[in-house]
Amino acid sequence: MIDNYIEKIAERSTSEITINECDYKKDGILYCGKCHTPKQGIYTVGRKTIKPLLLCKCGQEAYEKEEAEKKAKERELYIDRLRRSGIQDEKLLKCSFAIDDSPETKQSQAFRRYVDNWNEIAEKNIGLLLFGGVGTGKSFYGGCIANEIISRYTTPVIVTSIPRILNSLFGVEDKNGYISKLASVPLLIIDDLGAERDTDYALEQIYTVIDERYKANKPLIVTTNLSFEALKNPSDIRYKRIYDRVIEMCIPFNLSGVSRREAKAKAKAQNAKKLLF
């Protein structure tokens, strides 16, 4: 029985190792004609001696390179799946710190450090509140953070909006399961808070999602066009407990200044004039 097992090992090695024309025999075993290292071993088990084929030095290097490339490809595909399943706005998939036109600002630097220190950030449950006028880069930076954390840490991130959350809750049977998913994902980013419907049902669902996130002790990033004053003292009292919870969970960052959208539109118009007039 042992002899049969040994023979099977030898047969398997023979089928898995390629013998090249340049390979040669020396001291009773096969050597690689390229790197001149053994391609065959001698093993004695009991009364049985076998000479299974082995990977030579260059063969081992080629195998390790192939395995590394395979793992890198698998990781790349996994990251792509995470990004496409978690980031629900196609435009945000393209956001990257590499194309940030204001990398020197303290806000941009802080967001980069947020990613750099993600493991500690997640452990300490540190969220961000990005507020300011329209077109100042809030959604862009939210997308940058999401893409970078997914790519660097292979960590699931969900980037969504209140309207999307409400639509999903309306369309799914297992509402508790959906809310649980939003509560448990390592990082949840809610874009454009304050742009949602103001029905009692909508506000109750918004509070439930944010409160469940709070109870789960997971970081939350929120972007909004509202001012910090409007968040602290909302004109509609129904919003107060929602905004209070967000302020409690998130460190505020004011993204003010010239609208990036306006700046890009002007630059595009100038380029068009050069081409058309």
Question: Each PLM stretch: what is its role?
Answer:
Residues 122-143:
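Walker A/P-loop nucleotide-binding motif
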Residues 103-115, 131, 146-187, 196-204:
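Short glycine-rich substrate-engagement loop in P-loop NTPases that contacts/grips substrate
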Residues 120-122, 151-152, 180-182, 211-216, ...:
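Conserved catalytic network of the ASCE P-loop NTPase/AAA+ motor domain
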Residues 192-193:
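Walker B catalytic acidic pair
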Residues 187-189, 221:
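Structural motif
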Residues 94, 98, 105-128:
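P-loop NTPase catalytic core of nucleic-acid-dependent motor ATPases
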Residues 1-106, 257, 265-277:
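A short, basic N-terminal segment
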